[in-house]
Amino acid sequence: PDMLVMTATPIPRSLALTAYGDLSLSVIDELPPGRREVVTRVVPQDRRDSVYGWLAERLEKGGQAYAVFPMIDESSELRCASISGQGETLRRLLSKWPSEILHGRVEAEDRERIMESFAAGEIRLLVATTIVEVGVDVPEATVMVIESAERFGLAQLHQLRGRVGRGGERSYCVALHGQLTEEAERRLGVFAESNDGFRIAEADLEIRGPGDLLGKRQAGEPLFRVANIVTDRMWLDRSRADAKELLENLEGEGAQPFMQRMERKARGQYQRLAGG
């Protein structure tokens, strides 16, 4: 191949492109040597006190932990946990252990210092936003608590969970949630059920839709009004195989006019489906 694209959890549009044959797919479905699956629990926020008590026990045993929040500041419009609210409360409750706050407003120099201290074990609890979603590797961190987990996307939840379980110790991810919509309940159900990034990506595609395969939308309902890329995958594979066989066997003077007719027909069908 001319290009290799690597991802832990492909976005819906990228996964859909593999189905249409624009990308070949290879799946690494094994954990690196010595790693174990992260134990995941989805817990309603009215049990927050018991979760915080359990977190204190883990810190008492020498562990390190992340507490991730969807927002930095409290909002009167959005009913979700924030670093300035619940995050500061958590730090006071667990003041026995050194903790720090990390988010996008923290100066770059301070962010680097905080991460170095966390990696060295000097900071035991890191209260953060999704700034820790990628590029953070602290094998000794074995616990992650995600506040207002219903506010995060499925792939994002999986990426966050990947910050723990990077050493040989058993690791845990607890997703605290508020009131759930039907879609949020589906997301968290899949998240609790699977540690498989490809399964997560397939569920994300099913829930959010593939977006615009010929445009820029990375998720959402496709322009096509009949077939469903998830439930009708068999027909997609069959039609692609038939088209490939047809193209490979086109010979002679009649090939070019045939291709031109097919192109005109395809353009017309697409314009009708797109409402044009």
Predicted stretch roles:
Residues P1-G189, N249, G276:
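Inter-lobe coupling/hinge segments of SF2-like helicase ATPases
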Residues G168-Y172, L180-G276:
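C-terminal accessory region of SF2 helicases/translocases
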